[in-house]
């Protein structure tokens, strides 16, 4: 059985330390503050620098997806070492990253005809994409085959969720993610929109006037997922993700533990530049994914 290397685009928001621990290689997105100079997230641009610009300078960063060349450059050393490749990507509804990787795959298959290169749409982003990667890495470490890991990802992405609250719709509206009327109404009413990313699509989860109530609503919607689906919380792992409002991590985790004590919480995650360029500051979310042992592979 060939060994394989796990890749992801940078939208998974795994830290460099986590990438090393899980032996996951990422291909970063690019971020620009002036529309001219683009820097690779984490590798050329720290999150501290990014959030300073986003919050203190009230900037509107732009992002650019990894190029075909970026994926070819990332995949080639693994293929030359005789490894197969599994690459997990942000949902295609939010980015064309997966298409870049698919084009790279077609090019590389000519040079490495015996290699297996699997490009998978996670239907998710940021923390929920990270949870799928963490389970994939655990499977790899426990000796599961490439095909078993791909089977898990294709099944689990349908059960994976991220439910998040954002400070306002200003950044989403500026990026063309929502209609102007929705953005205007939100800003006038000073509400905090709650959004659910499910099956690769963005759904409105509600709205609240305070962040404290918003956190409670995030937990409520997470609990409702289990109530409506009949799923067992003990079969899932979860994490809290946030942009700049790290003080919300502890109260969110506390409410989540009280409401769903069987749900295993892993270390929280800081949402990176790729996603927060669109959501803006003041974003907090709950991510859940089902363990691989719960599926027939």
Q: Can you say where each PLM-predicted feature lies in the sequence?
A:
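Hydrophobic residues in alpha-helical segments
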Residues: 54-55, 79, 140, 173
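Generic beta-sheet signal
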Residues: 4, 83-87, 236-238
